[in-house]
C-alpha cells in the first residue's frame, strides 16, 4: 500500500480542515494510506518523511509566505537534502489565507522550491474554475484560479470549518488528483522493473 503524508501547520484550524478534506479525497481512491502530520510534531524527526511515497505540504499564508512552524520543518530537513533522500517522491502544496488573493502564490512557490531542491516531483492543480461553466462562485471548484497548488480562503476570525463549498470541493478533487497521479507514477515504475 502506498502512503501519503499531509504535513501542515494550522494556527486556527482552517489549514487543518483543508488538510482533512484533501485526505478525504485521497481516501476515495483505493490502495492508499493517508496520515495527517503536524509540522511541529516532525521537527525532531524529519526522517519520518522517508516512509511516505507522497508529501502534501500545507500552511496558512502569513505575510506572503509559509508559517514559521512549517518553515522550521522545511529547514530541519537539511540532513535529508544533503543526501537527497526525498528524491523522486511526489509532492504538492496547499495554503489558506483570509483574502481571495492574499499573496498565496508566493507561499506555494516557497513550497515548490523546497520540493524541487529535494528532487521531488511536483503535482499542480489541474481543476478548471467551475464558475466559467455557470456554477455559482462560492460553489465552484477552484474558484480562486490556482494551478500551482490548492488555494482556499477563510474569512478572518471564522470557525476552522467555515469555507465556501467550492473550496471544500476543490480540496476533495485535489486529493483525488494527487492520489491518481501517485498510483500512475508507481504503476509506470512497476512496468519499468518488470
Residue ranges and their predicted role:
Residues 32-42:
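A short beta-strand-loop structural module common to alpha/beta enzyme folds
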Residues 41-137:
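Helix-loop-strand module that forms the ligand-binding subsite of alpha/beta enzymes
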Residues 25-32, 83-85:
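Short helix-capping segments at alpha-helix termini
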Residues 2-29:
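N-terminal beta1-alpha1 ligand-phosphate binding loop
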Residues 126-194:
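Glycine-rich phosphate/pyrophosphate-binding loop and the adjoining helix
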Residues 18-26, 111, 174, 178:
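Hydrophobic residues within alpha-helices
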Residues 14-18, 107, 170:
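Conserved alpha-helical elements of sugar-nucleotide-dependent glycosyltransferases
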Residues 7-9, 37, 94:
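Short hydrophobic segments within beta-strands
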